[in-house]
Structure formats: structure tokens, C-alpha cells
Amino acid sequence: MKPKIFIDGEHGTTGLQIRVRMAGRTDLELLSIPEAERRNAAMREDLLNSADIAILCLPDDASREAVAMVAGNNRVRIIDTSTAHRVAPDWAYGFAEMDKAQPQRIRDARHVANPGCYPTGAIALIRPLRQAGILPDGYPVTVNAVSGYTGGGKQMIAQMEDDQNPDHIGAPHFLYGLTLKHKHVPEMKMHGLLERAPVFSPSVGKFAQGMIVQVPLYLEDLAAGATLETIHRALVDHYAGQSIVEVVPLDESAKLARIDATELAGSDAMKLFVFGTKGGAHVNLVALLDNLGKGASGAAVQNMDLMLSA
């Protein structure tokens, strides 16, 4: 029998992208709810309990409600794309490349929390340096990022694309999260293995899909002997053999004059760069990804495939 997959929230931005990625797959049976019935709790509960894997593309509270609907059904496994369970100890964090053992944790899990888009890039850069002993305890990490506006869901898409919208946003680029309490900070801290919460400054650009995440570092405040080359080597070693995450060679990075945030739009890949001057005082770590790809829907499908391979 084919595994049954139900996307709860399939008509939203992330859910639609997951459907696109599953189109044409003959190895799955997709359960679906009509858009007009998407708030029909009884119908949702029935579909959730009929699935082998339920992928939740819902706001946090609705995701918690969906989890409660299948609490007594040990057969149903869940991938939650909301923020609700990303730092919960009994949920596997769905960043498969985070550790060598993470794919198996995802395969074995009943509950998988899909990472946030910004944390995917930040953790990809920070965690290997913590594990290699390069980034010391207590280092004051800063994360700066820009995302495509689809990361804000249907509401922001309408605000950015419809100039007749009463809340139209005409700015080509804007900062938000100005109180420094963005909901992605806790997972950056936990899964980045940080002792202190990072200072996180997110922003949105006037492009639909794409993302750049930056982590600038002072070399003199890192472990003794840390250089541009040792940092790059730590990332290369960590992601050796990975097909989705690419660490760009230093000589290639050195030739770049700019990075286009939309380069990987429509892709589920992620590129990591280390920039700096040989013998210089600073390095800038950069992750490039699609906020709806490896940053959301692509990761959800990757996690689903891992769970089905158990």
C-alpha cells in the first residue's frame, strides 16, 4: 500500500509548494481537503487520523490543535512546519544535515519539527564551528538576513504585489523584528549550540523567493589559530558527502563581486560561503537558499522521504 500523506494547510504558501514538489509522484497517496472545508475541524481530524504522515502548514496554535487531534493515534506521524515545536525536547529537529546522526533521528521520529527559513541558514553556519571548537562559549553572535516576501505568507504576498491593497508595502527593502524578539531566535540558540541568544536582524526584499543569511565574526575573538581557512575547512568537513548543502570553495568565493539573493529561488539546495581577506581581522559567513525551498517546503518533503525510508 502507498503511504497516505495529508497536508493540513495545503492551500497556504508552504502547503502549495509542498504539493508542487509532490506532483507526479506515484509512490504516495495524497489526502486532500477542499479549500472551502479547510476550517472544518471534524473533516480535518478524520483526514489527520487517516494519514501515515501529516504535514502541518498552519499557524502555531492550529498546529498544536492538530497534534492534539491525533494524540491517541500512534500510527500517525507528523511534520510540523510552524514554530510551535522546534525547541521541544521530544520532537526531532528536521535539519537533516545538522549532524551525521540527524537523518536517523528523523527516520525514527514520530514528531518532526521543520526548521524555520532563517534558522536553517544560521544554524548551517554556526553549529559546525561550535562543534569544531572554533566558536567559543559566550561569543556574541549576530545574524543578519534578508528574505523573499513569500516568507510572510499570503498576507504579505498581497501587500507586496497588490498596489491597491490598503496595507500595500512599496518599499524595495525593509527591516522588521525591531524589538529583537523574533520567534526564530530560540531555535537558532538551541540548535546552533549557543550559550547566548544571537542578535538577529531580519529583513524582507521586494523579490518573491530567495534568502541570504549572514554571520559576521571577529577572528581575534575565536579560538586560537582560527583563520579564514580553518573556518572554511570546518564547514567542508561537516558537510562532506552532502548533496543538498554545498560549501563554495574559497577561491570561487574570492572571485565574486556580489551575491544574488534569488539565485537559488525554486531550488531546494543551500550554498555556504566564507568571505574575508587572508590575514584579515574578520570573516563573514553567508548562507544562500530559497526561503520556500530548503527553508520550508523542500525541507518538509526531504523529512517526509526520510521518515518513509525508516
Swiss-Prot record:
Reaction(s) the record says it catalyses: N-acetyl-L-glutamate 5-semialdehyde + phosphate + NADP(+) = N-acetyl-L-glutamyl 5-phosphate + NADPH + H(+)
Gene assigned in the entry: argC
Superkingdom as given in the UniProt entry: Bacteria
Localization annotation: Cytoplasm
Molecular function (Gene Ontology), one example: N-acetyl-gamma-glutamyl-phosphate reductase activity
Reported function: Catalyzes the NADPH-dependent reduction of N-acetyl-5-glutamyl phosphate to yield N-acetyl-L-glutamate 5-semialdehyde.
PANTHER family given in the database record: N-ACETYL-GAMMA-GLUTAMYL-PHOSPHATE REDUCTASE, CHLOROPLASTIC-RELATED (PTHR32338:SF10), N-ACETYL-GAMMA-GLUTAMYL-PHOSPHATE REDUCTASE, CHLOROPLASTIC-RELATED-RELATED (PTHR32338)
Protein name: N-acetyl-gamma-glutamyl-phosphate reductase
The protein's enzyme class: oxidoreductase
Lineage, broadest ranks: Bacteria, Pseudomonadati, Pseudomonadota, Alphaproteobacteria, Hyphomicrobiales
Active-site residues per Swiss-Prot or TrEMBL entry: 117
Similarity comment: family membership: Belongs to the NAGSA dehydrogenase family. Type 2 subfamily.
GO BP terms in the entry: L-arginine biosynthetic process
UniProt organism field: Rhizobium meliloti (strain 1021) (Ensifer meliloti)
Recorded metabolic or biological pathway in which this protein acts: Amino-acid biosynthesis; L-arginine biosynthesis; N(2)-acetyl-L-ornithine from L-glutamate: step 3/4
Pfam families to which the protein is assigned, alphabetical: Semialdhyde_dh (PF01118), Semialdhyde_dhC_1 (PF22698)
